[in-house]
Amino acid sequence: MHRLLLLMMLTALGVAGCGQKKPPDPPNRVPEKKVVETSAFGHHVQLVNREGKAVGFIEIKESDDEGLDIHISANSLRPGASLGFHIYEKGSCVRPDFESAGGPFNPLNKEHGFNNPMGHHAGDLPNLEVGADGKVDVIMNAPDTSLKKGSKLNILDEDGSAFIIHEQADDYLTNPSGNSGARIVCGALLGNNEKQ
């Protein structure tokens, strides 16, 4: 009898738990990587390292959800590393340090990092998780960016924007770029980057 009563109580608890809704995502969560058809991308950016060697590319398109979808395919990176990845305010990749790209893309004047209670820069992107072969190939979403002329969030304005890979992981908190170290790879997005 006790076993039957215990079994009925456990069953009732299990059924009651099924109707619970998933809690909403926290406001400053790291955007998830996505699956998107790569043929739909309209802007192509070549990536170069500090020696000037081509090490991959980035493709960009307006997202069906919000912001931009960014496809990055890169090689010759540190195997197994987690590397900071950001959008910078100028489409310039002067070697060897890529400082010509200026500061982080931040048209909304926020603080840096997905874990920062003051919000995050529009140019903050998730860390790149490099494979054991030194390669990364991923599509991610940048919700606070656009290619629309006249938009404050447009990364394709008069001076373009740059995509930068850093030498270390972004801690998602520290200004201005999450303690992610030197800029080691750069790709400049300018008006002539449209895919043919």
Swiss-Prot record:
Disulfide cross-links? 93-186
Source species, domain of life? Bacteria
What does the UniProt keyword field contain? Answer: Cell membrane, Copper, Disulfide bond, Lipoprotein, Membrane, Metal-binding, Palmitate, Signal, Zinc
Major site of localization recorded for this protein: membrane
The region annotated as signal peptide is 1-17
Q: Which residues bind Zn(2+)?
A: 71, 137
Where, per UniProt, does this protein localize?
Cell membrane
Pfam assignment, any one = Sod_Cu
Explain how, and how many, cofactor molecules are bound. Answer: Binds 1 zinc ion per homodimer. The zinc ion is bound between 2 subunits and mediates dimerization.
According to the UniProt entry, its GO molecular function terms are: copper ion binding; identical protein binding; superoxide dismutase activity; zinc ion binding
Q: Where is the lipid attached (S-diacylglycerol cysteine)?
A: 18
* Cofactor(s) needed for function: Zn(2+)
Q: How does it sit in the membrane?
A: Lipid-anchor
What cellular component terms from Gene Ontology apply here?
Answer: plasma membrane
Q: Where does Cu cation bind?
A: 86, 166
Question: What GO biological process terms does the UniProt entry carry, in alphabetical order?
Answer: removal of superoxide radicals
Q: Where is the lipid attached (N-palmitoyl cysteine)?
A: 18
InterPro entries xrefs = SOD-like_Cu/Zn_dom_sf, SOD_Cu/Zn_/chaperone, SOD_Cu_Zn_dom
Q: Which PANTHER family match?
A: SUPEROXIDE DISMUTASE CU-ZN -RELATED
Which family does the entry's similarity section mention? Belongs to the Cu-Zn superoxide dismutase family.
Instruction: Report quaternary structure and partners.
Output: Monomer, and homodimer. Largely unstructured monomer in solution. Well-ordered homodimer in the crystal.
Name the record gives this protein:
Superoxide dismutase-like protein YojM
Q: What lineage, starting at the top, does this entry show?
A: Bacteria, Bacillati, Bacillota, Bacilli, Bacillales
Q: Which gene encodes it?
A: yojM
